A protein has these predicted regions:
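Low-complexity, small/basic-enriched stretches
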Residues: 1-62, 127-156
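Nucleic acid-binding interface residues in structured DNA/RNA-binding domains
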Residues: 3, 7, 62-156
Length: 156
């Protein structure tokens, strides 16, 4: 499926595609091969400013409205993930206990997170390793794992 992004932000660790509907972030994902777009209005400019500050280690809480989508279970899990503080991590099992669930479904909810960074699934790790990111398994060690490691390092 081809996504059309309202805004593209070039971060130091990867390109971010952002969809905005009714002044709420609808999707924010690391995507390869997108060209930067200029901020269109005050909402776009503020989001761009916050992203820039985050990557400069000068912002640790985003203050932009977003539209959290998914199944009721996914939304429940992602709301718990949203509470993980900057610089902290929790295991899939930790989140599962809070959601009265199991680690694997928590991982699936994180894999389908439509708004990376704002809902910080990169802060959810395995008990014995860093865990996956955006559907990429830790063993693959590809682009998404580079992004997860980089985000955790930024927040270090």
């Amino acid at each position: 499926m081809l996504n059309i992004y309202d805004m593209v932000f070039l971060s130091p660790i990867g390109t971010i595609g952002i969809s905005i509907i009714n002044d709420k972030v609808h999707e924010l994902k690391f995507i390869n091969n997108l060209k930067e777009s200029k901020s269109k209005d005050s909402f776009h400019k503020d989001l761009s400013r916050q992203l820039d500050l985050y990557f400069k280690k000068k912002l640790n809480v985003f203050d932009v409205p977003y539209d959290l989508r998914g199944t009721q279970y996914q939304i429940n899990v992602l709301k718990k993930v949203a509470k993980i503080k900057y610089g902290s991590t929790q295991s899939y099992s930790d989140i599962a206990i809070k959601a009265d669930s199991h680690a694997r479904p928590v991982g699936n909810a994180c894999r389908n997170n439509p708004i990376q960074l704002l809902i910080p699934c990169h802060r959810v790790v395995g008990k014995n390793n860093i865990g996956g990111f955006s559907g990429e398994n830790v063993k693959k060690n590809g682009n998404m794992m580079f992004i997860k490691k980089s985000l955790l390092e930024i927040e270090g």
